[in-house]
């Protein structure tokens, strides 16, 4: 008899605690279905936003190398979804219908304007999704537009947007904060009563690859000589 790995998190049930975070592998139905078929208990759908969709660049990944070309970390410059809101919502509804026992959270990022949140929240809720994730952590591309980490770094904004979401949506609200802040506890304490929603501490952390000896990035990602 197999062990029971089922969980309940923020009122969301899942057959196991192994979920995929919002990222390129969760950006469309094809990828999410493959994850479910492989046994993943839940996914956070790649961040949705307002139309028109963001325009991503390629390549979106780079590696940080150590001695002997060992990969020590992966950096990405991916923005939010580059597909239309309509297509994403349609696929989310179909996937949830086909896989009702799996957790499906929808990551969201729209401007700090209440009407923008008031518009998108009912559309997401109508898909049958289990909850929403507020992306207050993206450190590249979106903060320049007043979203992502630009929100997570201001506790008053975190409180304001979370309150809007709890007002205009009945789904569980998960707040994903940015680590690119002096004291993350200030933002974590910001969500309004009746108690803070679950919060994920880390999105992406800003970094750059530099040589230990000398200055500037190593050519071609090469490590320092011995």
Where are these regions (language model features)?
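Short, intrinsically disordered C-terminal tails of secreted or membrane-associated proteins
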Residues: 219-225
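Intrinsically disordered, low-complexity proline-rich tandem-repeat tracts
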Residues: 197, 217-218
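N-terminal capping/small domains of soluble enzymes
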Residues: 1-105, 109-114, 118
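Short polybasic linear motifs
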Residues: 214
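Alpha/beta enzyme core
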Residues: 33-38, 111-211, 226
